[in-house]
Curated annotation (Swiss-Prot):
Protein EC: 2.7.7.6
Protein's recorded name: DNA-directed RNA polymerase subunit omega
Matches recorded under SMART domains: RNA_pol_Rpb6
Cleaved signal peptide residues: none
Keywords on record: DNA-directed RNA polymerase, Nucleotidyltransferase, Transcription, Transferase
GO cellular component: DNA-directed RNA polymerase complex
Amino acid sequence: MARVTVQDAVEKIGNRFDLILTAARRARQLQLNQSVPLVPEDNDKPTVIALREIEKGLINQDIMDAQEFQKMAKVQETEEAAVALITE
C-alpha cells in the first residue's frame, strides 16, 4: 500500500479542502480513463496517483480547467463543422 503524505500537496493547492476537491476531480479523470497519469502508476489507485501529481506540481485546478476548456472547444469546433456540412 502506498503511503502518501499530503502536507506537500496541501502547500501546492493552498488548503486541505481545495486539495480534496482537486484530488477527487483528478482521480475521477484517471478512473474513467479520460486522462493519462503524469506520474508512474506503480500499481496505485487513482486517488494516490492524483495526490502524487498534485504534490509534484503537475496538476492543479487551473491546469484541469484549461484542459477541460480545450476539450470543450474541440467538441464545439467538431459540432460546428458537422452543422456546416449538413447545411451545405
